Amino acid sequence: MSRLRWIVIGVLFSFALQAEAKHFIHIQEDASADQKTAVLILNGFGGTKKGCQAQMAFWADRGMDVFIPDVLLRSSLKESSDALEAFVEAQHLEDYREVKAICYIAGAYLLHTQLETHPMANLTRIVYDRSPTQERAPQTAMARIPKLGMLKLGKVLRDLSVATWPDVPESDQLKKGLAIENRATPLMRFLQEEAEAMGPLVYDWQAIDPTAHDAFHVALDHDMMYVRWDVLGEPFLHFFEHGVFPADLPRDRIHDRPFDPTYPLPE
């Protein structure tokens, strides 16, 4: 079987797993919302059932209520945004003392759209998963494998590939941090030519988001960012508490071989 066919089968399988995901919610019943902090995790296309389970396994034991909505895969990006709006309203996130968010790529689009029309005065932290390679997935997939992408993700993939992104939220109480992937997924290695044709890959965190307060680089790919809480958990908790990441984490690009699958992974 050709390498291309194996890759396509793998992509189909990973997209199929995404379709299984549902809301994951953990609520502590020992206090009212105005005495608690909520963690809102907004996944992207990589938010599989396995990924959500790994997220919940780490975050449910951290003294906060945890909300992982399944809102992305709808018939359009507009319906995805509407689904998030309905989820936030149904869970009464405005009642919490604080809300701290983790946003993957498409999840960031949904959060920013939500905040344009429904500002959250209690939102105090956002950690963004940023990936110079994976952020080109919608455009490159639509360029090379549009039928496959549309088959599994529908119009949302197409919509996101041409979407104008909402402004990045800013407020006096909000601190934003970036976790920057330095490794490409198998999908993006397959789409390397299309990704590189879009222009230079930018890894300078202050160029990626000039409004961010801090960042760190990690030798993980996008799929791993959903499950490697042994690597990501403590840095994210530290940012939630202090508004900065631990001082010993790398602020500069780790290596210049994002498409090299042999580069060592974090232990």
Regions found by a protein language model. Name each.
Residues 1-7:
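Bacterial N-terminal signal peptides that target proteins for export
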Residues 11-19:
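Hydrophobic h-region of N-terminal signal peptides that target proteins for export
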Residues 24-27, 31-66:
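Short, surface-exposed "cap/lid" segments of acyl-processing enzymes
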Residues 40, 59-69, 78-173:
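Serine-dependent carboxylesterase/thioesterase catalytic core
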Residues 43, 103, 180:
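Short beta-strand/turn micro-motifs composed of small residues
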Residues 46-47, 108, 133-134, 182-185, ...:
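Short, solvent-exposed loop/turn segments at secondary-structure junctions
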Residues 46-50, 72-80:
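Acidic-and-aromatic substrate-binding clefts and catalytic sites of carbohydrate-active enzymes
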Residues 170-267:
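C-terminal catalytic-base region of ester-bond hydrolases, centering on the histidine
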